[in-house]
Structure formats: C-alpha cells, structure tokens
Amino acid sequence: MSEVRVGENESLDSALRRFKKKCAEAGVLAELRKREHYESPSVRRKKKSEAARRRKRR
C-alpha cells in the first residue's frame, strides 16, 4: 500500500496528488482492474498469446 506523509506546511491537495502519483507508479489501479473478475487460466493464456501476436505484428 502506498503511503504519503503530509508535511506541516503542505496542503491536502498536494498530498493527495502525491498519493495518486505513487499509486499509479505502483500499478495499484491496474492490478485492481485486472483482478476485478476471475479469469480462468485458459483465458489468461489466450489473452497473453493474443497480446504477443499484436506486439509481433507491429
């Protein structure tokens, strides 16, 4: 979990901005979206191979 300490003279807005940036860098939201619904291993393999195919084509 990302943690941000608010300084004495720091506004709450800037602390919130730093927190959001840390969460984005840590990939918290991406991980949340990925785990929102269960994916069976076969579906995961299929998505992975399709992504590799798309990367290879470009």
Curated annotation (Swiss-Prot):
GO biological process: translation
Tagged with keyword Protein biosynthesis: no
Chain segments carrying region Disordered: 34-58
Molecular function terms, GO-annotated: structural constituent of ribosome
Matches recorded under InterPro entries: Ribosomal_bS21, Ribosomal_bS21_sf
Keyword Ribonucleoprotein belongs to the record: yes
Protein name as catalogued: Small ribosomal subunit protein bS21
Family: Belongs to the bacterial ribosomal protein bS21 family.
Native species: Caldicellulosiruptor saccharolyticus (strain ATCC 43494 / DSM 8903 / Tp8T 6331)
